[in-house]
Regions:
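Glycine-rich phosphate-binding/hydrolytic loop that grips phosphoryl groups
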Residues: 107, 162, 232-269, 280-282
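Cysteine-cluster motifs in flexible loop/terminal segments that predominantly coordinate metals
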Residues: 269-289
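Adenine-nucleotide phosphate-binding core of ATP-dependent small-molecule kinases
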Residues: 28, 173-213, 223, 231-232
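Glycine-rich phosphate-binding loop plus the immediately following alpha-helix
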Residues: 111, 115-118, 143-186, 246, ...
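N-terminal glycine/serine-rich phosphate-binding loop of ATP-dependent small-molecule kinases
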Residues: 1-90, 282
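Conserved phosphate-binding catalytic cores of ATP/NTP-utilizing and phosphoryl-transfer enzymes
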Residues: 1, 91-121, 244-248
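Glycine-rich phosphate-binding loops at beta-strand->alpha-helix junctions
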Residues: 59-66, 210-227, 231
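Gly/Thr-rich phosphate-binding beta-strand-loop-beta motif of the actin/hexokinase/Hsp70
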Residues: 1-24, 113, 120-141, 157, ...
Length: 290
């Protein structure tokens, strides 16, 4: 499989991933405050790839910033920058309301998760917002839930009250009771988000009739779920793997017109220590403790 530079532009940060022979070999993350610096980093990563003229694919939940980055990358490299949505379809089927618009990150995460585990699963993306999405046993994205992320919730409490301070999210101190205002806020957000995910996963399992594998990704995933028995694996770069999986499906469909772009697997797979074996980067909490 040829090389690929995958760029995921989020609300606050951009991730740049270099793929060689389906393996994610390098990742750079930068704040979005300077799109030119992000484009320069992408140019450097592109030039480091072994294949001259490697394709560049950009996904975005923040189109104004992504447009600036994509234009600058094209100017710097002379390469065509493909966009998820316009040029590359997320490699996942959906069962949603007609004309529903779903964030690219949610669909790409679903594509990567399904490619990795090949069975019903939930993807929890703990970033600026937290999303909890369900993919059924034939690889169809069924939708899910969206809620404020940890930092957004803390900021909202500060901005909409007179007395609550501005604080940054982190894991609260040990113990069930916040012994001061700051710790009480952290307890409320931290345990509240964990409880939200538990309740939603139980709700999905009851409707589906089986308990799904649960994968977590996003900047706050490790802090929220590294000690949570509900989550089977933490996959830091799931969106980048979703870009690669979607580009791979499009590439294979173009190379072999008779082959469908997305193949529905029916075999089940377990998330094992060390990952699923499909190069998606998943690792269980057992790995972290080993």
């Amino acid at each position: 499989m040829p090389t690929l530079l995958a760029i995921s532009v989020g609300n606050s940060r951009t991730a740049i991933g270099s793929f060689t022979a389906s393996e994610l070999t390098a990742v750079t993350r930068l704040d979005n405050v300077d799109p030119i610096a992000v484009a320069a980093a992408a140019e450097g990563a592109w030039k480091m790839l072994d294949s001259a003229g490697a394709p560049i694919v950009v996904a975005s939940t923040n189109d104004p910033t992504a447009d600036r980055i994509a234009d600058e990358v094209e100017a710097r490299t002379g390469a065509e920058v493909l966009r998820v949505g316009a040029d590359v379809a997320p490699a996942i089927g959906t069962h949603l309301d007609a004309h529903a618009k779903t964030g690219q990150d949610r669909l790409l995460n679903a594509a990567a998760a399904w490619s990795c585990v090949k069975q019903a699963c939930v993807v929890v993306d703990a970033g600026t917002a937290i999303t909890v999405d369900f993919i059924d046993g034939v690889g169809t994205f069924q939708g899910g839930a969206i809620a404020p992320g940890a930092q957004m919730a803390l900021r909202a409490m500060h901005e909409h009250t007179a007395a609550l301070p501005s604080i940054s999210y982190r894991e609260p101190d040990a113990g069930s009771f916040g012994k001061n205002t700051e710790q009480a806020m952290l307890q409320g957000v931290h345990v509240g988000l964990q409880g939200l995910v538990w309740k939603l996963v139980e709700q999905y399992a009851m409707q589906y009739g089986a308990f799904p594998v649960v994968l977590a990704t996003g900047g706050d995933a490790a802090t929220l779920f590294c000690k949570d028995e509900l989550v089977n694996a933490i996959v830091p770069d799931l969106t980048l793997h979703g870009i690669h999986e979607s580009w791979r499906a499009a590439f294979e469909a173009e190379s072999e017109p008779s082959r469908p772009a997305v193949q529905r697997a029916t075999a089940t797979a377990e998330v094992r220590p060390g990952g699923c074996g499909d190069g998606c980067g998943c690792h269980t909490k057992h790995d972290d403790q080993a």
